[in-house]
Regions:
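Short coil-to-beta strand junction motifs in C2/discoidin
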Residues: 115-122
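Conserved aromatic beta-strand anchor motif in extracellular beta-sandwich/beta-rich domains
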Residues: 124-130
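Surface-exposed loop/edge segments in extracytoplasmic proteins
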Residues: 133-153
Length: 240
């Protein structure tokens, strides 16, 4: 509107505003700003440049509690019997430990003022494929996923204190750090049991849902990503 609506796309003599990826080009600010339209254009450029800094975090399952650890996409679990029995533990591991590495570049952005930096955070939730669960929007799968965040109760942090991070009343883990985190799924056999066939699932995925909220000029911007690790069965054979 106004000067913007009258632009003839002449970047030499008129206003312009152009974006490519996370780079904003504008015709204001190259010389002294002398009128309200130029001030508005310059402010809009600053706001737009700040908005594109709200990027999605990068998350992956890894093999150990270390930000430099190798990515882990598949974990094999061992059973010593083909069929499920109610009296014996058939998986060799009662509990299974997992690790995720979270890289959120919003957490280290130099473009944000201190008030915005103080309010930003990362939340974590964990799910496992289970018929008792529900399909989750954004997860990238049509499988039913059961929220096991509260059952996990506590996660450990690379270089953090021994007490770790407890699940909050909202059913999520909260942090403000890029880091590697570890958690344990108790009684993993309960989720690996295929009740319909009285045997074990050949594949069962665990999902991590990571949401990053960053404030840009006091306006929250939320980005959510999902990642998973696939648990696949291997069976020990009785050689006697």
């Amino acid at each position: 509107r106004g000067a913007y609506g009258n632009s003839t796309n002449d970047v030499r003599n008129d206003y312009y505003f152009y974006s490519k990826g996370n780079v904003i080009y504008t015709g204001a600010g190259h010389s002294s700003i002398s009128n309200a339209d130029e001030i508005q254009l310059f402010v809009n450029a600053i706001v737009a440049a700040a908005n594109v800094t709200a990027v999605k975090p990068e998350v992956s399952f890894v093999k150990s509690l270390n930000p430099s650890a190798e990515v882990e996409n598949i974990r094999y679990y061992m059973t010593d019997q083909k069929l499920w029995t109610n009296t014996d533990q058939n998986t060799l591991e009662k509990d299974m430990d997992f690790y995720i590495n979270v890289k959120d570049y919003n957490m280290v952005s130099a473009d944000l003022n201190q008030d915005d930096l103080d309010k930003q955070e990362i939340t974590m939730q964990f799910y496992i494929e289970d018929d008792k669960g529900e399909v989750q929007d954004g997860s990238g799968t049509n499988q039913r996923l059961l929220d096991i965040t509260r059952q996990i109760q506590n996660i450990t942090e690379y270089g953090g204190n021994e007490s770790g991070i407890n699940v909050s009343n909202d059913g999520m883990f909260h942090t403000r750090k890029n880091n590697a985190f570890g958690f344990s799924v108790k009684n993993i056999e309960d989720y690996l049991h295929n009740s319909s066939n009285n045997d074990y699932k050949s594949s069962c995925k665990i999902y991590a849902k990571i949401s990053s909220t960053v404030y840009l000029y006091n306006v929250p911007k939320k980005q959510t990503v999902w990642t998973s690790i696939d648990l696949k069965q291997r069976q020990l054979f009785d050689l006697d």
